[in-house]
Swiss-Prot record:
It is found in: Cell inner membrane. One of its GO terms (molecular function) is antiporter activity. CDD domains: MFS_TetA. Keywords: Antibiotic resistance, Antiport, Cell inner membrane, Cell membrane, Hydrogen ion transport, Ion transport, Membrane, Plasmid, Transmembrane, Transmembrane helix, Transport. Belongs to the major facilitator superfamily. TCR/Tet family. It comes from Pasteurella multocida. InterPro entries: MFS (IPR011701), MFS_dom (IPR020846), MFS_trans_sf (IPR036259), Sugar_transporter_CS (IPR005829), Tet-R_TetA/multi-R_MdtG-like (IPR001958). SUPFAM superfamilies: MFS general substrate transporter (SSF103473). The chain crosses the membrane at residues 5-25, 42-62, 72-92, 94-114, 131-151, 159-179, 215-235, 247-267, 291-311, 337-357, 362-382. It is a multi-pass membrane protein. This is Tetracycline resistance protein, class H. The lineage of its organism: Bacteria, Pseudomonadati, Pseudomonadota, Gammaproteobacteria, Pasteurellales. The keyword GTP-binding does not apply.
Length: 400
């Protein structure tokens, strides 16, 4: 594995750690500036600000990396993140925290750049495998982040921010020394020509060759993935009367299984049967998991359901791999930025929508949301089957 890939994976895991690192201590830090009555409001606004900045700036950073190269954008993001965490560590007013979260959302929107860099350095046949690695290490970071934040938060509410600033600074130096620009020179030159810098070109790049269907599929898969993320705690407490320990253990098992399927299994399936077949398999398995959780009330169903939900995560790297092979090198940043934005949008609307539906449906049937997820998958599978019959195996697009 070359040094650039290692740096890409390190940046990805550090971004994921950063998401969860401050969660345990942010309320404590807010207590220094706001009253108890307004704490929850400010906490929610800060989280929403971060997510909103990710939605806005992921495609922007992706496009900038197409134009100027992956390395400058990654170095800028790491430097900005290090300075931002220092700002938050030594904040003396509430507005400094708000500015810090805005900057964190901007500089943390590097998922598109990392995915673009990964597509630059990996052969097309192996992209699903390496996108699976990205998803796997991101999952590791999401597990480590809250644990580390809790441990460091016991020392001081400011300590997680100091740790994040130091770790980003170290990775900045490593990237400066060992990360080589991954984008081909001809792609950089092409993206700097006047005709490639028009607003219409940016907007129309994905209108070609029917990639809309697969972008919509990606969005719906990510949206369905917000169902367990939103209601798992409430659902298991209501149906199985679980305590926090049991819930925490089940989430840990789901996290480990998710990493396994994304980092190891997805790539092997894609190499053997292709990305589209892997996508169909993952949707079918995830649909089975949703049906199990919708109808079966025995606790023994949890393990097979968790396996199904985790295996359903293979659809994301497989779709990334397929879409990445379907665009030219000089459009990778735009593509990956679009995918990251779609993911972040589902992370905003999914919890709001599904929490609302669950709160009103639980009194009648607590399995309604799982059934809705299964129905969405069934509709996707049927639509995908007919879509594949009408389209050619590969739709190559280019930036005019």
């Amino acid at each position: 594995m070359n040094k650039s890939i290692i740096i890409i994976l390190l940046i990805t895991v550090l971004d994921a750690i950063g998401i969860g690192l401050i969660m345990p201590v942010l309320p404590t830090l807010l207590n220094e500036f706001v009253s108890e009555n307004s704490l929850a409001t400010h906490y929610g606004v800060l989280l929403a600000l971060y997510a909103t900045m990710q939605v806005i700036f992921a495609p922007i950073l992706g496009r900038l990396s197409d134009k100027y190269g992956r390395k400058p954008i990654l170095l800028f993001s790491l430097l900005g993140a290090a300075l931002d965490y220092l700002l938050m560590a030594f904040s003396t007013t509430l507005w400094m925290l708000y500015i810090g979260r805005i900057i964190a959302g901007i500089t943390g929107a590097t998922g598109a750049v990392c995915a673009s860099a990964m597509s630059d350095v990996t052969p097309a046949k192996n992209r699903t495998r390496y996108f699976g690695f990205l998803g796997g290490v991101f999952g590791v970071g999401l597990i480590i982040g809250p644990m580390l934040g809790g441990l460091l938060g016991d020392i001081s509410a400011h300590m997680p921010f100091i740790f994040a600033a130091i770790s980003h600074s170290i990775l900045l130096i490593l990237s400066l020394l060992f990360f080589r620009e991954t984008q081909k020179r001809e792609a950089l030159v092409a993206n700097r020509t006047p005709e490639n810098q028009t607003a219409s070109n940016t907007v129309t790049v994905f209108f070609k060759k029917s990639l809309y269907f697969w972008l919509a599929t990606y969005f719906i898969i990510q949206l369905i993935g917000q169902i367990p993320a939103t209601i798992w705690v409430l659902f298991t407490q209501y149906r199985f009367d679980w305590n926090t320990t049991s819930i925490g253990m089940s989430l840990a098992v789901l996290g480990v299984l998710h990493i396994f399927f994304q980092a190891i299994v997805a790539g092997k399936l894609a190499q053997k049967w292709g990305e589209k077949t892997t996508i169909m398999i993952s949707m079918s398995i995830d649909m089975m998991g949703c049906l199990l959780l919708a109808w079966i009330g025995h606790v023994w169903v949890i393990l097979p359901a968790l396996i199904c939900l985790a295996a359903g995560g293979m659809g994301q790297p497989a779709l990334q791999g397929y879409l990445s092979k379907s665009v030219d090198d000089n459009a990778q940043g735009k593509l990956q930025g679009t995918l990251v934005s779609l993911t972040n949008i589902t992370g905003i609307i999914g919890p709001l929508l599904f929490a609302f539906i669950y709160s009103y449906s639980v009194a009648y049937w607590d399995g309604l949301l799982w059934l809705m997820g299964a129905i969405l998958y069934a509709m996707l599978l049927i639509t995908a089957y007919f879509h594949q019959r009408k389209t050619t195996p590969k739709a190559v697009i280019s930036t005019p």
